[in-house]
Curated annotation (Swiss-Prot):
Pfam families: HGTP_anticodon, tRNA-synt_His. SUPFAM superfamilies: Class II aaRS ABD-related, Class II aaRS and biotin synthetases. This is Histidine--tRNA ligase. Signal peptide: none annotated. GO terms for cellular component: cytoplasm. Belongs to the class-II aminoacyl-tRNA synthetase family.
Length: 446
């Protein structure tokens, strides 16, 4: 290959790390606006943590024998100082680290939320990517089932706000450490009797993380898992009361749920409540949000013993659901497109555009693609393609008369069902367009 061909070779993105193009960004913005509004309504505050953390944060926090730590982390050694670093595969551990490092809980519990990209080194498929985005909440310093219920209710409110249906809630309790220890002994003994059915993954997990065997996707193993000793039968009075308290609040708020004894989650830091919101509309990747209580984690990462719970949801999966249910909002165009011809008109066009922007209108000012003067015909084609509601037209005649042409590009009461160009004095242009935009909005609401 010649040097010239090397220079001209087309480069592509990393597989499983996707571009979000302008035609898709509107859906992302719609979701982000909706979820941020919901989070504010519950009194949650935004926290932003770095994408790169020390690897030890995740090996200690998530657990060394989890799939994420064993197989899915993007880790590297910093050539500058030899530190072992990892691109965050999830954000709960990082939020907890930040809360400890900055002594955030000195004055009481905190309700926090985050949004951003996460990274896992796995085979890309529908709903699973190497770079993916999550929004999540962490309620730090709250011990009761009421907070577990609140974060579940937040999800239900978001589904309602987005118009999503058919997302079902599954819950379980993992109890306390001593209860899990008793169950672990019984579970291992049970699974050892079925070694002939266990696949390689199950055998690998049998003595390191046997709970994860219950979460198998292997049909041959599912019958074995179905009849395995259930952790819920090992719960003591405290754990049982916590779980029953959660159920009472959910029932009081008309949130339907199913108790799934095989729901264990893939991270080691969970205890007591765990839950997932699942759908059958995304194939195998049916979980759209998941979370639970992780009371041991803050102490595990060097803080004082502190209760905590939270959830995370995959944004790409939510957007897939919105598309599946035809809930994608139309991309909104700008309000005004300013067309012009001639130097004097161009100079005035800049002034007009800035004045309109001062009022809060979204304005595109025509700029020639090739540096040459564009005909009004070609400019109006661009104006129409931009999605603008109105075009402002400035030519030699308009500049000489101190006026502007205004053309409605969409049907509205302002255009009386027609699209004739109106002549408006420049000093009245801003007020005219504001009134026209209000009228067109009211027409759209009828």
């Amino acid at each position: 290959m010649t040097e010239q061909k090397k220079r001209l070779e087309k480069l592509s993105g990393v597989k499983g790390m996707n571009d979000i193009l302008p035609q898709d960004a509107g859906l992302w913005e719609f979701f982000e606006t909706t979820v941020k509004s919901m989070l504010r309504s519950y009194g949650y505050q935004n926290i932003r943590t770095p994408i790169v953390e020390h690897t030890q944060l995740f090996t200690r926090g998530i657990g060394e024998v989890t799939d994420i730590v064993e197989k899915e982390m993007y880790s590297f050694t910093d050539a500058l100082n030899g530190e072992n670093l990892t691109m965050r595969p999830e954000n709960t551990a990082a939020v907890v680290r930040a809360s400890i490092e900055h002594n955030m809980l000195y004055d009481g519990p905190k309700r926090l939320w985050y949004i951003g990209p996460m990274f896992r080194h796995e085979r890309p498929q529908r709903g699973r990517y190497r770079q993916f985005h999550q929004v999540g909440v962490e309620a730090l310093g709250f011990a009761g089932p009421d907070t577990d219920a609140e974060i579940i209710l937040m999800c239900q409110r978001l589904w309602d706000d987005l118009g999503l249906t058919g997302i079902k809630l599954e819950i379980n309790s993992l109890g306390l450490a001593e209860e899990r220890a008793k169950h672990r002994v019984e579970l291992i003994a049970y699974l050892e009797k079925h070694m002939d059915v266990l696949d390689e993954d199950a055998k690998r997990r049998l003595y390191t993380n046997p709970l994860r065997v219950l979460d198998t996707k292997n049909p041959a193993l599912q019958a074995v898992a179905q009849n395995a000793p259930k952790l819920i039968d090992f719960l003591g009075d405290e754990s049982r009361a916590h779980f029953e308290g959660l159920q009472r609040i959910l029932k009081a708020n008309n949130i339907p749920f199913t108790i799934n004894p095989r729901l264990v989650r893939g991270l080691d830091y969970y205890n007591l409540t765990v839950f997932e919101w699942v759908t059958d509309k995304l194939g195998a990747q049916g979980t759209v949000a998941a979370g639970g209580r992780y009371d041991p984690l803050i102490e595990q990462l060097g803080g004082k013993p502190t209760a905590a719970c939270g959830w995370a949801m995959g944004i790409e999966r939510i957007l897939e659901l919105l598309k599946e249910e035809n809930l994608v909002p139309e991309n909104e165009g700008c309000d005004v497109y300013v067309a012009h011809q001639g130097e004097a008109a161009r100079d005035q066009a800049f002034i007009v555009a800035e004045r309109l922007r001062d009022t809060g209108l979204d304005v595109i000012l025509h700029c020639s693609p090739d540096g040459q003067a564009s005909s009004f015909k070609s400019q109006m084609k661009r104006a129409d393609a931009s999605g603008a509601a109105f075009a402002v037209i400035l030519g030699e005649d308009e500049i000489a008369n101190g006026t502007a042409g205004v053309k409605a590009l969409r049907d509205s009461s302002q255009s009386n069902g027609k699209s004739e160009q109106q002549t408006v004095p420049l000093e009245d242009l801003t007020e005219y367009l504001i009134n026209a935009m209000v009228a067109s909005t009211e027409d759209g609401d009828d």
